[in-house]
Amino acid sequence: MSDSNPSQSNNRRSTTVNRLSAENVTLGYDQRVIASELSAEIPDNSFTVIVGPNACGKSTLLRALSRMLKPSTGRVLLDGQAIQSMPAKKVARTLGLLPQSSIAPDGITVGDLVSRGRYPHQGLLRQWSRDDERIVQESMASTGVAELADRFVDELSGGQRQRVWIAMALAQQTPLLLLDEPTTFLDIQHQIDVLDLCAELHEEQGRTLVAVLHDLNHAARYATHLIALRGGEVIAEGAPGDIVTADLVERLFGMKCQVIDDPETGTPLVVPAARKARKVPARDAEAPAKTVARAAS
């Protein structure tokens, strides 16, 4: 496995025209530039994951791709059009977003929140319909929250709430779905549940997903396409099996490691190098017996 040449990564673009891309965008907040002349393409029908160290521009790029952040230079293209010039409802019918921090209104039920995903499809001549109700019910069923429809969102666990937000995004019925750190604040079981759900949406429904993840091993296991950012620059992109190497991990995070095959999936698995060799204390002859006794008690 070998990662991309950093000098070629930003300039090398596929000849295929994909639905969502950023072209030479400069991104930042106020006067602080996060990324300069950054280009990235999201392959159609992929599960693309953006990875990199803290403050490298992952969420900033996702915000630009979702029309939440306007580039100071360059442009984001959605279906060949500059996304900033498109009507908000038109974008919302094509692209759904699950932000990093989602806050539900007080006193709202799961069913009501998921129903809000149908808002982009409403208008003066098109009000709530049986089709809308069917889509909401299907979205809740596919995310495993149908039985929670009458529960208040603020009563749910973190994992349940995240599934509800994904259900709302599904109710938009967009071919593109962007998720900013969807596993943040979740325990390991709920992280895997959410990522399994994302994989199902990609594989079974054919949606194009773009997610920001901190865990490189999760990214390598679930993504079909990785974009590796450092300092606002794409330093590698491609299939996890092609680019995730010990050299790439050291360049991204400054961390030495081994990259082995995941015994469950065969995808790359990053094993960090131990900073210090641990000394195993010598055991006396009675130690095994004491250990067994504690385990049995």
Predicted regions and their residues:
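Conserved ABC transporter NBD signature motif
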Residues: 74-82, 91
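Conserved ABC ATPase signature
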Residues: 127, 152-156, 160
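Catalytic Walker B motif of ABC-type/P-loop ATPase nucleotide-binding domains
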Residues: 177-181
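Conserved structural motif at the start of ABC-family nucleotide-binding domains
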Residues: 20, 34-37
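Helix-to-loop junction immediately C-terminal to a conserved catalytic motif
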Residues: 66
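ABC ATPase nucleotide-binding domains
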Residues: 252-297
